[in-house]
Every structure is written in C-alpha cells, then in structure tokens.
C-alpha cells in the first residue's frame, strides 16, 4: 500500500476494520440492542447523525441512517508528504491533492484550485448539498471564497461552509 494513502483513502481500510470489530462486538452482546451504522468518513457520520430521529424505532433509524450514508460522497484536500505516484499520476512533495472515495481527483499547487477541481469531480446532476469543512490550515476567508465560487458554479445546490478545525486536511468536502 502506498504510504501516501495512509492519510485519506488509507484511513478507509482502518475504518473497515473498526466496522468489523463493532459488528463482532454486536454479535457477542446478547443483552443489548446494538446497531452498527457502517460509516467510513466523517461526512458519512454527520449525515447518519442528522438522519437520526429519536421518536423512531431503532430499526427505522438504522434504515434511514444507512440509506443516508449511501448518498454521501467524500473529498479531502491535503498535501503530499513525499514524491510518489497515485493513480498513474506523478506527485511531488508539497503538491496539493484532492482525494475522493475512489482515488485521486485533483493535484496542483494551489489549495483553492485543487479544492474546486475536487468538488467539480464529485458533483453530478443528482447533487443537492455541498458541505465544506475547512481545517486549521485554511483561513476563513479562503473557505468563504471557495464556498462562493462553488455556489456560483452550482446554483442548484445548497452550499455550506463550516469550520471543522481538522489537522492535515485543508478541507473535507461532502456532496449529497
């Protein structure tokens, strides 16, 4: 496995192991009603939480939460820590990379340009909501500027910009 992917897509492998462990714990527990919602990204987790309705049964919530996470596409904008190749593209240390659910979506030198290209690769005709969670290394001004550009490019989508405060990732993007 490419060490570069240990940040980003490589995290999905770790989360799959966590899901397996959670399901195993559920199988071993007889006196509690445990439901595992198999989220693999932070945006999926947020969508699952928003889908939860306290008045509904556990089974209804499980169905709604699981359906909700199926609609989420996740993107992450970060930087390369070393020279490498990802998806047949040459990456140099310090390059800005846009990673999606299934691989590299964009690479370049400018954070906002790579973020825009990443989002463009994620949005389709069914997209309704674009959420941008900017990290500790992206200014509020840059995040708001990105949000405005995305609103102009996709007027039929709702665009939200929120401070996520995450390290390493300039922004994490959710498209639903």
Label each residue range with its predicted role.
Residues 7, 30-33, 92-94, 100-101, ...:
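Short coil/turn connectors at secondary-structure junctions
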Residues 17-31, 142-147:
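Short Gly/Thr/Asp-enriched flexible loops that form oxyanion-binding sites at enzyme active sites
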Residues 12, 130, 156-158, 162-166, ...:
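Active-site loops and adjacent core secondary-structure elements that bind or stabilize anionic groups
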Residues 1, 34-36, 148-151, 157-161:
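Polyanionic, low-complexity intrinsically disordered segments
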Residues 25, 42-113, 119:
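Internal, active-site/partner-interface "lid" segment
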Residues 14-18, 32-44, 51-55, 134-139, ...:
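Short, ordered loop/turn segments at secondary-structure junctions
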Residues 2-9, 13:
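Single conserved hydrophobic/aromatic residue that forms the stacking wall/gate
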